Amino acid sequence: MADLQATLDSIYTDILPRIGEGKVADYIPELAKIDPRQFGMAIVTVDGQVFRVGDADIAFSIQSISKVFMLTLALGKVGEGLWKRVGREPSGSAFNSIVQLEHESGIPRNPFINAGAIAVTDVVMAGHAPREAIGELLRFVRYLADDESITIDDKVARSETQTGYRNVALANFMRAYRNLDHPVDHVLGVYFHQCALAMSCEQLARAGLFLAARGSNPMTGHSVVSPKRARRINALMLTCGHYDGSGDFAYHVGLPGKSGVGGGIFAVAPGIASIAVWSPGLNKVGNSQLGAVALEMLAARTGWSVFGD
């Protein structure tokens, strides 16, 4: 592990000439304001070492990466019963596709596309007012990262609320098929706030370390999920974590991961480390263009791909 900082530094040097590539998510007004010429990366190893480079301490909107934490909460509440509400298969469609949801009777393909994440949020809301569910998620993420400074960006949440028409349509479809138990506006209120979680690369890598360490956080001693559940969440991230770019990410990077349209990607090298990278410019399927390039470089230079070096 001693040369990990040198590896990160070399990746940063190779990425620097390309910083600014990709297009920021302009359909969310607050994200459209983000300067694309930023790049950060952090690695937290299972033995507690932290390596960082670039803008790794700048908080950004984690967006769909939050779905990993919400899924963990939902599985903790209802266990395998969750899979009656949402599938475990790659979608092959855009993350906000309506056609597939209608064709499959209101059961989303997986928990990482928007419809699936909205159904997962509905599960977490059981017994909670919307504000309480938002608070539960924020407390959980702070607990995972051991960092009380993590917040939700209310401006981003409001921005999404004002423009999230497709998500409103998805939620109404599921409500019509009786796959949402709570009022649509309540569920979406929580969903938009969870997507507005603001975290730095280092905070994100710390929060997700339990998935690299068989369900426990070795830095805090907290047991989060069973080894079996950690393995299964990682499997879902590998197959479904990058929308209709999931196969391409597995091919080039070979690590379980989850992307967000804020430009972040969270990835796991099981038994070794958790990784977070951020570069706001997105590729055509909504994943960080340079984030994916940096992770491909990391996997190639470390041999961390789950498929071998």
Curated annotation (Swiss-Prot):
> Record's SUPFAM superfamilies?
beta-lactamase/transpeptidase-like
The protein's Enzyme Commission number: 3.5.1.2
Reactions catalysed: L-glutamine + H2O = L-glutamate + NH4(+)
Positions of substrate binding: S64, N114, E160, N167, Y191, Y243, V261
Which keywords annotate this record?
Hydrolase
Q: Does the keyword Hydrolase apply?
A: yes
Q: Which family does it belong to?
A: Belongs to the glutaminase family.
**Binding partners and assembly:** Homotetramer.
- UniProt cross-references to PANTHER family, sorted A to Z: GLUTAMINASE
The protein here is known as Thermolabile glutaminase
Organism whose genome encodes this protein: Rhizobium etli (strain ATCC 51251 / DSM 11541 / JCM 21823 / NBRC 15573 / CFN 42)
Q: Lineage, please?
A: Bacteria, Pseudomonadati, Pseudomonadota, Alphaproteobacteria, Hyphomicrobiales
Q: Which gene encodes it?
A: glsA
